[in-house]
Amino acid sequence: MNKPIVGITMGDPAGSGPEITIKALADPEQYSYCRPIVVGDVKVMEQAKKFVGREDIVIHRCEKVSDALFTPGTIDVLHLDLIEDISKFEIAKVSVEGGNAAFQCVKKVIELAMAGEVDATCTNALNKEAMNKALEYYHGEKSDGYTHFDGHTEIYATYTHTKKYTMMLAHHDLRVVHVSTHVSLREACDRVKKDRVLEVIEIANKACKDMGIENPRIAVAGLNPHCGENGMFGTEEIEEIQPAIDIALAEGINIVEKKPTPPDTVFSKALGGWYDIVVVMYHDQGHIPLKVEG
């Protein structure tokens, strides 16, 4: 069977993406797993290989995916002419040009996936400030009228026409999905609503089943210290989270505890194998434990 073709976005050319990509694809072992092709600008990738001291690597310019060689020692780049003058482009600086480049790479790799030209996508880092400056600068002309995205998740949802979605992070058997992500902590608390919590529980259940987990064991983290202590430290668990859990249970979804699990203990249990996935209420509640572990 042919190995899957993986489209890898270059990321913001002022950031770490091009450098990380060169280092990763310089390892021949990657080609035993998949057939990688970078979506980006050849000029940026040529500069990146010099920056990391891998001038032995050949950057192979492709106009279409079928041009790729998929050969160790050669990095295939589906060329998008994104940076006008690479000699004047500043590394580690937020810019409209860099933000637009990063966005166009994501948009293109989604297009390739939707067309079946790549089997999976992998995204390097983009700078949200730079990207949104670019979207606003061009008044949506280079982004189909859109002038703001919070991040990769929202771009993917928009261009795949997906209405119900959330971010998942995974490291081995630790999986996390979020009720909200890139919003202020104050707004994140306001977004803890029954309908959204239920929606994310349902997404988590389906995602685990798609990954081959027959009856996913789900934990739902509370929002407040000790899950609010029966309303003493907040009422979201009583008014929003528990009602969502009750509906999910009635739908046959396996919420192990049948109630919110205290945020300060849910991940010790998850790492101990109690759950297949944890539904968290906001960005850092899920990102911190997963990034510490992974």
Where are the language model's segments positioned?
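Contiguous, glycine/small-aliphatic-enriched amphipathic segments in soluble metabolic enzymes
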Residues: M1-F149, R191, D195-A219, L223-M281, ...
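A generic local secondary-structure boundary/capping motif
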Residues: S66, Y156-A157, Y165-L169, K209-D210
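A generic structural signal for well-ordered coil/turn residues at beta-strand boundaries
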Residues: T71, K164, D173-R175
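Conserved beta-strand scaffold positions in the cores of enzyme catalytic domains, especially
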Residues: D76-V77, Y165-M167, V176
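FAD-binding core/adjacent interface of flavoenzyme oxidoreductases
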Residues: G145-T166
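Ligand-binding beta-strand-loop-alpha-helix segment within the catalytic cores
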Residues: L169-R191, D195-L198
